[in-house]
Regions:
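Short acidic, glycine/proline-rich loop/turn micro-motifs
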Residues: 8-12, 95-96, 139
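Beta->alpha turn/N-cap motifs
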Residues: 1-4, 38-43, 52-64, 87, ...
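A ligand-binding cleft/hinge motif common to bilobed small-molecule-binding domains
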Residues: 43-47, 60-69, 113-118, 139-175
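Ligand-binding cleft/hinge of the Venus flytrap
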Residues: 8-13, 24-33, 110-131, 159-163
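Acidic, polar ligand-binding/catalytic clefts
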Residues: 21, 25, 29, 34-96, ...
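Short glycine-rich His-centered loop
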Residues: 1-18
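Extended ligand-binding regions for polar small-molecule ligands
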Residues: 21-30, 88-91, 95-101, 106-109, ...
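Periplasmic-binding protein-like
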Residues: 77-85, 152-191
């Protein structure tokens, strides 16, 4: 997903960059492997991996809830799923999301966490999905949605880069860890 800053995104120079991409490049260099950044549509990640178009998924990839679906590395980063709202909104906790429109990236960890919280989502006026978080932030800026559910790492970066008047709610939706996911059973590449 090339729209997941600061983990992976297209920089001002038009090149792919980000924490995970730089980490992957360094690991490949140290292991003597070829590094190639391959942008994919996030909701097609399983098909891309199964077809062999990509060798691994390494871009803010949440292990939690997917432990049996991939062959994983050890976790390398802790993360949370949170809600982002406008600073001037009356939303200060998850309870305040009742009757509000919430947006989330399709096939994301935040969407999975929301599916695990039906008692919360039942209170929303509407739960919308979008292809990427850049669109979600534009929707929040324009008042089309009241909140975004997303990774805290990405939320903090987006708020800082946009110099936006947003806040992250204190009560998180879920706790999780990032890892590198390989096709189920591909221990050979993982163990290099």
């Amino acid at each position: 997903d090339q729209n997941f800053p600061p983990m992976g995104f297209v920089g001002d120079d038009g090149e792919y960059t980000g924490f995970d991409l730089e980490l992957a490049q360094e690991v490949a260099k140290r292991l003597g492997l070829e590094y190639k950044a391959q942008p994919i549509a996030w909701d097609s990640k399983d098909m891309e991996l199964e077809s062999g178009n990509i060798d691994c998924i390494w871009n803010g990839f949440t292990m939690t809830g997917r432990e049996d679906d991939y062959t994983w590395t050890e976790p390398y980063m802790a993360n949370q799923q949170v809600f982002v709202v406008a600073n001037d909104s009356d939303i200060n906790s998850q309870a305040d999301l009742a009757g509000k429109i919430v947006e989330v990236q399709a096939d994301s960890s935040a969407e999975a966490a929301l599916k695990e919280a039906p008692e919360l989502t039942a209170t929303f006026k509407e739960l919308l999905t979008t292809a990427d978080y850049n669109t979600a932030f534009m929707d929040l800026e324009q008042g089309a949605v009241d909140a975004i559910a997303m990774d805290v790492i990405v939320a903090g970066y987006q708020i800082q880069q946009r110099n936006a008047d947003f806040k992250i709610l204190d009560d998180s939706l879920s706790e999780e860890e990032y890892g590198v996911g390989f096709k189920k059973g591909n221990t050979e590449l993982r163990d290099k």
